[in-house]
């Protein structure tokens, strides 16, 4: 598959998916990253958000940057999953 993954901190591919990566592996990775993102974001609002709001501005920026990067990775994994599903269905990617 060799789908390049671009992360917000780099301008070139940092990782490439293995040619043997199947739709299930992509789905599992997406699910894991979404669960992590949900947990991170749960700490930014409501009563739990008090600790977040007390963080230094630079820490809040880095925290939200991590959330942003995870969201970008999930988007890229979704794109790769679409390509993989088309490939498995015998359609042109």
What residue ranges belong to the model's regions?
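Sequence/structural signature of long amphipathic alpha-helices
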Residues: 1-93
